[in-house]
Amino acid sequence: MKRKVPNIIITGVPGSGKSTLCEELKEIINKELLKRNDMEGFEMTHLNLSNIIKDERLYKEFDDELDASIYSEELLNEYLKKKYKLEKGGYIIDFHDINFVKDVDIIDKIFLLTIQTNFLYERLEKRNYTKEKIKNNIECEIFQVIKEDILDHFPNTNILQEIENNDLQQYDNNLSIIKNWVLSYI
């Protein structure tokens, strides 16, 4: 049975603009839902999984070289199952990895934000990422690691839409693309 509101994943390497886009997207879509009589009581919720993992300590170890925690898929899934009803829909899931998804049927669409490496380098440098961490993320973008993970993990390749997110014009266009997809689902 189709959910009344979809679950979407916004993914991409760190620095591709996921969290900023997700937060604004949530606000825009929820304003649209308020205008519709048939959507009373429904709203989209932004789940920033990186923040949840950090705040709830859902990691198994720390990688000193990359200055990053290695999250536990098991702990994350237990937490999500206990705290949220993903099967009901209404979630904008913001994360750089999709391998945590055990039930692929709970996801209706994946938007993969891509970014040119020169823009990515600048954004990660502004975040004071280590040289090794910047190199690792740029290599992930060049070799399309996240896209390959999605295609390996989800049998329905129509679930994926790639969108480039280098500048403000593309950002605004991406907001519109995703908003329109969500509203057409409803």
Swiss-Prot record:
InterPro entries: Adenyl_kinase_AK6, P-loop_NTPase. Keywords: ATP-binding, Cytoplasm, Kinase, Nucleotide-binding, Nucleus, Ribosome biogenesis, rRNA processing, Transferase. This is Adenylate kinase isoenzyme 6 homolog. Belongs to the adenylate kinase family. AK6 subfamily. Residues 126-136 are annotated as: LID. It is an enzyme of class 2 (transferase). Its EC number is 2.7.4.3. The lineage of its organism: Eukaryota, Sar, Alveolata, Apicomplexa, Aconoidasida. Its main location: cytoplasm. It comes from Plasmodium falciparum (isolate 3D7). It is found in: Cytoplasm; Nucleus. GO terms for biological process: ribosomal small subunit biogenesis; rRNA processing. It catalyses: AMP + ATP = 2 ADP; ATP + H2O = ADP + phosphate + H(+). Broad-specificity nucleoside monophosphate (NMP) kinase that catalyzes the reversible transfer of the terminal phosphate group between nucleoside triphosphates and monophosphates. Also has ATPase activity. Involved in the late cytoplasmic maturation steps of the 40S ribosomal particles, specifically 18S rRNA maturation. While NMP activity is not required for ribosome maturation, ATPase activity is. Associates transiently with small ribosomal subunit protein uS11. ATP hydrolysis breaks the interaction with uS11. GO terms for molecular function: adenylate kinase activity; ATP binding; ATP hydrolysis activity. ATP binds at G15, G17, K18, S19, T20, R127. Residues 48-71 are annotated as: NMPbind. Monomer and homodimer. Interacts with small ribosomal subunit protein uS11. Not a structural component of 43S pre-ribosomes, but transiently interacts with them by binding to uS11. One of its GO terms (cellular component) is cytoplasm.
